[in-house]
Curated annotation (Swiss-Prot):
GO cellular component, one term: cytosol
UniProt main location, coarse: cytoplasm
The protein's name: Translation initiation factor IF-1
Gene name of the encoded protein: infA
Organism of origin: Zymomonas mobilis subsp. mobilis (strain ATCC 31821 / ZM4 / CP4)
SMART domains: S1
Amino acid sequence: MAKEELLEMRGRVVELLPNAMFRVQLENDHEILGHTAGKMRKNRIRVLVGDEVLVELTPYDLTKGRITYRFK
């Protein structure tokens, strides 16, 4: 999939789930399941409840996404 096809949205982590998954509430009040991107895992960036994050969504499945950035 080309990178241009991904949708980027901001959201807030509302729940930590097993297997490094997170429930994220997007700006438009939709809730999705998100997992951390590989570079975030590699650099050991922690994501906690209440953190503001940037999520990449694919147009094929808008219920799951990849957390690519944690805002400070």
